[in-house]
């Protein structure tokens, strides 16, 4: 790497005047969280709709998985049911092997192509079989990523132990059995540059990054990390660019940092002095950082700044492609819509807005404004309306239970699933209550999000505060969400004609996982304030042929 290589002339000028909504809301949120008293989760058990999994096996999660030729392969067969459980996989491509006790498929595949693998899970009460399509080619993240991110609970105070406890909780709580697989470290891990690549090294809160990644991989999970092309991140740690050719930022040299190498000006105000770190630098250390992440075994990158620009997006894309492992590339934040083709071409996910908050105003304004991204949402490329704000959140260090009502939380998860949005849990998983767990472990709802077609739902009807979204699924059925954004319970309905269907159809309640009725014309239901009814419409068994547009 050449540390003296500079960015093109148009990109040199620091962006000092561009104040983002993200930064304002994030910092205000941190202050509010710091002042709030610590809370415990209330008893929300009466609102649980998701049935408990059966003792017999059910294979869950994505039905299609993409990997690039020669990249390291890690896929854990997600399955519910009592343990012990054994797994088998027929038709694995050359280079892959299965651990029958853990269900982990590992190895490397060099031959491009599509491989249909027949999976089986068996325990004492029974067995389950399902196909998995492995696509060895140029695309990864063929379904929206599902995992956890540290920001919405720990923010800049995140530690190695908190990340590790979150990974353990993902496994021990059973979330991994439903397809959740990423453990992503957000801002706050960075120390100063060093090592053989002169790359960002972890601060003292992360004493053994390589060991941490290895331990999480040994659980069958994947690991994500965070950076920025600014010289400093939103939380004022160093970024992948510098204002000096040796990579040591001027504020580091002058000692304007705390024990974790976070920017800290003596007698100064971080918010007032933010422009000293929130800007692009002339010297790129992207290549060095990417080499380090590859050696650690990183699987996911959140690259965060505003405004996004083509040069830095493509630079990181190209660097990540030099690795012998696949790294999901997620852009943040507030991606300009006019450049959507570029975000789709060079990234796997792109944040469409600033930071989400745990309020109805935030989740509804973000969630119901995603329609324009529909032409760019597809397997391998996902518009990202931000993380899930359920459970214990707070942006560090003191957490509080989400301010969303139960109905608003059902709307949150249902809408994100219909949108084919990345699903990143933002709460402290070690404190997860039963209601929050029920929201995250409903496999029939997750199936809507992880459907192999990768289609974003479209609004098929809207009147005032009521809107109906519909989404075609791979098996020929349709997922339909009836949303009431108003303050009063209302009756809502859809006709088969509205959905482009005909014939006898079975309407199934996805949250309760039970069939409601057979429908030949119209389905009607009551929808609570700020609530949703999420159903799946299947062709009936009357002998009539149901046809979709």
Report residues per predicted region.
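Strand-loop-strand motifs at the edges of beta-sheets in extracellular beta-sandwich domains
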Residues: 94-111
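Solvent-exposed, low-complexity, repeat-rich "mucin-like" stalks and linkers
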Residues: 40-41, 57-82
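Aromatic-lined carbohydrate-binding/catalytic grooves of carbohydrate-active enzymes
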Residues: 152, 166, 170-310
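C-terminal beta-strand-rich structural cap/linker in extracellular carbohydrate-active enzymes
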Residues: 518-544
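A short beta-strand micro-motif common to beta-rich folds, especially ectodomain repeats
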Residues: 77, 113-125
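Carbohydrate-binding surface patches
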Residues: 410, 416-419, 424-426, 462-501, ...
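C-terminal edge beta-strand
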Residues: 45-47, 126-137
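Glycan-recognition surfaces
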Residues: 260-266, 276-277, 311, 326-428
């Amino acid at each position: 790497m050449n540390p003296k290589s500079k960015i093109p002339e148009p990109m040199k000028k620091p962006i000092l005047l561009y104040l983002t909504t993200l930064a304002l809301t994030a910092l205000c949120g941190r202050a509010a969280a710091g002042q709030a008293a610590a809370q415990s989760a209330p008893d929300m058990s009466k609102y649980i709709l998701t049935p408990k999994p059966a003792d017999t096996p059910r294979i869950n999660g994505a039905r299609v998985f993409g990997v690039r030729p020669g990249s390291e392969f890690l896929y854990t067969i997600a399955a519910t049911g009592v343990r012990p459980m054994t797994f088998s996989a027929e038709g694995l491509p050359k280079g892959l092997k299965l651990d029958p006790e853990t269900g982990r498929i590992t190895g490397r595949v060099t031959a491009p192509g599509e491989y249909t693998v027949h999976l089986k899970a068996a325990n004492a009460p029974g067995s389950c079989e399902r196909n998995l399509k492995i696509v060895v080619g140029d695309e990864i993240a063929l379904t929206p990523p599902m995992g956890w991110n540290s920001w919405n609970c720990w923010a800049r105070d995140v530690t190695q132990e908190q990340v590790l406890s979150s990974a353990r909780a993902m496994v021990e709580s059973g979330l991994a059995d439903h397809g959740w697989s990423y453990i992503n470290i957000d801002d706050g891990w960075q120390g100063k540059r060093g090592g053989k690549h002169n790359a960002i090294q972890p601060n003292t809160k992360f004493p053994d990054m390589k060991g941490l990644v290895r331990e999480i991989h040994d659980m069958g999970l994947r690991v994500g990390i965070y950076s920025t092309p600014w010289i400093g991140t939103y939380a004022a740690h160093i970024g992948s660019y510098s204002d000096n050719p040796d990579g040591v930022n001027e504020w580091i040299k002058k000692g304007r940092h705390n024990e974790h190498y976070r920017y800290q000006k003596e007698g100064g105000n971080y918010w007032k002095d933010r422009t000293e770190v929130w800007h692009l630098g002339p010297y790129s250390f992207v290549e060095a950082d990417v080499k380090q992440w590859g050696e650690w075994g990183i699987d996911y990158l959140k690259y965060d700044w505003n405004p996004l620009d083509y040069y830095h997006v493509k630079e990181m894309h190209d660097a990540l492609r030099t690795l012998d492992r696949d790294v999901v590339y997620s852009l943040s934040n507030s991606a300009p819509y006019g450049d959507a083709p570029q975000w789709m071409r060079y990234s796997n996910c792109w944040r469409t807005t600033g930071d989400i908050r745990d309020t109805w105003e935030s989740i509804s304004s973000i969630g119901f404004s995603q329609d324009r991204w529909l032409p760019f949402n597809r397997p391998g490329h996902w518009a990202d309306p931000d993380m899930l704000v359920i459970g214990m959140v707070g942006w560090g260090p003191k957490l509080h239970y989400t301010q969303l009502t139960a109905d608003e939380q059902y709307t949150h998860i249902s809408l994100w699933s219909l949108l084919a949005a990345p699903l990143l849990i933002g709460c402290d998983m070690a404190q997860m209550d039963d209601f929050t767990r029920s929201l995250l472990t409903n496999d029939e709802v997750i199936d809507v999000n992880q459907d192999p077609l990768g289609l974003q739902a479209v609004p098929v009807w809207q009147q005032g505060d009521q809107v109906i979204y519909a989404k075609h699924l791979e098996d020929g059925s349709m997922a339909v969400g009836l949303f009431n954004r108003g303050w009063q319970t209302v009756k809502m309905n859809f006709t088969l004609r509205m959905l482009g269907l005909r014939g006898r159809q079975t309407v199934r309640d996805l949250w309760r996982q039970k069939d409601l009725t057979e429908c030949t014309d119209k389905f009607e239901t009551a929808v609570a304030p700020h609530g949703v009814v999420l159903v799946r419409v299947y062709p009936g068994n009357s002998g009539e042929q149901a046809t979709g547009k």
